[in-house]
């Protein structure tokens, strides 16, 4: 399997190099993106959160056009203040889905964990997060908000 992965990476013009005796390999995916995707791509950032991916893409590409979608209002407002002057970034306070609707969205103490999915009580993951944020498992969901959901196809037709 390792040889196959190395062969595929080599086909893209990159070489895997050992970084330790324990046979770990280092691949710089930023370089892979920069060299194999056009210089000014159109990027859809689904779940923009606070704009971490936008910052990464701005560092990798010259002038990417980024359409970011973030349904959590506080995170959207943060991104808006950060990127409002960049004409190549289109921020959308909306979620994407398979149909246009209003849907309940679980807002968590760590907003990048917020989701349409229900949080499963009693899991190790939830116990750790609750402890990290000084709350109970039930308290980890800070609110449930109705958010607008649209289909990507509809967004592209309109924009």
Which functions belong to the PLM regions below?
Residues 2-159:
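Phosphate/nucleotide-binding beta-alpha loop and adjacent structural elements of enzyme active sites
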């Amino acid at each position: 399997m390792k040889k196959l992965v190395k062969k595929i990476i080599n086909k893209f013009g990159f070489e895997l190099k050992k970084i330790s005796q324990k046979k770990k390999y280092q691949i710089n995916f930023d370089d892979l993106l920069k060299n194999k995707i056009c210089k000014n791509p159109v990027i859809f950032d689904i779940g923009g959160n606070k704009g971490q991916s936008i910052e990464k893409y701005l560092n990798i590409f010259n002038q990417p056009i980024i359409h970011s979608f973030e349904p959590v209002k506080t995170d959207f407002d943060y991104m808006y203040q950060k990127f409002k002057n960049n004409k190549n970034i289109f921020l959308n306070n909306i979620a994407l889905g398979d149909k246009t609707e209003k849907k309940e969205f679980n807002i968590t103490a760590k907003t990048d964990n917020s989701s349409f999915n229900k949080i499963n009580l009693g899991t190790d993951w939830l116990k750790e997060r609750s402890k990290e944020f000084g709350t109970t498992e039930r308290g980890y969901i800070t609110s449930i908000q109705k958010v607008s959901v649209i289909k990507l196809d509809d967004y592209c037709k309109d924009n």
